[in-house]
Amino acid sequence: MLIIPAIDIKDGKCVRLTRGDFSQQKIYLDNPLDMAIIWRKQNAKMLHIVDLDAALTGEMVNFERIRQIVEELDIPVQVGGGIRSADDVKRYLDMGVGRVVIGSAAVTNPELVRELMKTWRASKIVVGIDAVNGVPKIKGWTESANLKDFELAQRMKDMGIERIIYTDITRDGMLQGVGYETTRRFAELAGMKVTASGGVTNSEDLRRLAGLQYCGVDSVIIGKAFYECNFPCQELWYNFEEGICLDHNFSTARKR
């Protein structure tokens, strides 16, 4: 199972929210690039980046910060947050982003997905479904869609989408355990590749999710649990290494 660290960017800083609530925002680092380098040094094979400002406003205000991360690292980066047009997608993919995550637009403008699938390979476009009790939430989780989560997934599958990033909002940022049953139900009904997200707290959560590979769950995005050092290996790195060097020319970075 592929483990993907998450980086959320708000006002240019690396933050984490609790259940998507912007009033419950915690800043972890002022420079998201430094955070990306830390995760890469801890053996990340992919990063998941969300532009929270873009999700709120539709303006890609953190585009250059994301570009820095993409150019600096030697691993794929997937990006979501406020991507609402084919031009937005093209800007990110032309810049070198590995894949783009379509969120609310999959509900509000499904023709965008159809258009994208005519232009890009399925590996470049994924859809994020964030749900509460099986109902997708859109527009920063402020509105509910008029269909079930698995129904939305099946519509996307019919358009050529092969992967869904599925977030159980009730668990997101709570550090109270992954939404195992909701993820299992969704994956079984969707019949697609699924990246699980929301609530992963410890190694036991990862073991449980690994048991869902039979229904397509092959990867997981981890946010707050990493930032709060919930995994023993992180304590080793932080306590016994002589500091994590944030030299942007570390050995795995691309040479400029």
From Swiss-Prot:
Its main location: cytoplasm. Its EC number is 5.3.1.16. It catalyses: 1-(5-phospho-beta-D-ribosyl)-5-[(5-phospho-beta-D-ribosylamino)methylideneamino]imidazole-4-carboxamide = 5-[(5-phospho-1-deoxy-D-ribulos-1-ylimino)methylamino]-1-(5-phospho-beta-D-ribosyl)imidazole-4-carboxamide. GO terms for cellular component: cytoplasm. Pathway: Amino-acid biosynthesis; L-histidine biosynthesis; L-histidine from 5-phospho-alpha-D-ribose 1-diphosphate: step 4/9. The keyword DNA repair does not apply. Belongs to the HisA/HisF family. It is found in: Cytoplasm. It comes from Chlorobium luteolum (strain DSM 273 / BCRC 81028 / 2530) (Pelodictyon luteolum). The active site is at residues 8, 130. GO terms for biological process: L-histidine biosynthetic process; L-tryptophan biosynthetic process. GO terms for molecular function: 1-(5-phosphoribosyl)-5-[(5-phosphoribosylamino)methylideneamino]imidazole-4-carboxamide isomerase activity. PANTHER family: 1-(5-PHOSPHORIBOSYL)-5-[(5-PHOSPHORIBOSYLAMINO)METHYLIDENEAMINO] IMIDAZOLE-4-CARBOXAMIDE ISOMERASE. It comes from the Bacteria. Keywords: Amino-acid biosynthesis, Cytoplasm, Histidine biosynthesis, Isomerase. This is 1-(5-phosphoribosyl)-5-[(5-phosphoribosylamino)methylideneamino] imidazole-4-carboxamide isomerase. SUPFAM superfamilies: Ribulose-phoshate binding barrel. InterPro entries: Aldolase_TIM (IPR013785), His_biosynth (IPR006062), HisA_bact_arch (IPR006063), Isoase_HisA-like (IPR044524), Isoase_HisA-like_bact (IPR023016), RibuloseP-bd_barrel (IPR011060). CDD domains: HisA. The lineage of its organism: Bacteria, Pseudomonadati, Chlorobiota, Chlorobiia, Chlorobiales. It is an enzyme of class 5 (isomerase). The keyword Nuclease does not apply.
